[in-house]
Amino acid sequence: MTKIILLHHLGLGDHLITNGMVREYCKMHDRVAIFSYPKNYTSVSFMFRDIPNLEVIPGDEAFALLFMFNNKFRRKYDETKNVGLPHLDIFDSEPMEKQFYRLAGLDFAKKWESFRVERDRSREQALFDKMKPKGDYIFLHDDAARGLAIDRKKVPADHAVVSPASGLTDNIFDFCSLIEKAKEIHLIESSFMYLVDLLPYTNPEQKLVIHRYARPNPVWSLPALKKNWEIID
């Protein structure tokens, strides 16, 4: 087996999309290295803390490309694999996420089949207690500061709203209990949407809503989702 550098898009949502990919590569290789924006490092390293042969290297795309270039001379890794731009075809009818997995040489079903994160229930409970939702509540995530705001008229007014405000935690997985216990989930297309869709939990009465109008995306980059979402365009 070999040592490989795997580069994919570095958004936190992209890390969730490629969780299954990374885990499959760690089965196939002796050593795997991936990259993470420093701001996402806590979440990414937490998500993969159960994999001993994975190295998460903090750095942006420019750092990652330079690291991969320098590896040609240092030969610390036997192989490099880039499954993101410039290898994606935005004019292809194949969705972006499927292209990721095809470029990685993996069945797209591995996105869900191989997804895994070891939850820390004590951390989740600490955040749940800190936010103290009472009764039925809505978990809502948007980004009004960037102009990606959910129209509150499209959200039921008879429930409290809980949102992941900045400064609460630097680990997205601390929100898992708040997510799974919510009466409704209202999201823009973001890392939280991917977390909700990929996270295995049981709440059959929970309503899932994506407010797509708040963050429109090209058709080729629309998410591939498994759960029963209502989409508001």
Predicted regions and their residues:
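Catalytic machinery of carbohydrate-active enzymes
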Residues: 1-233
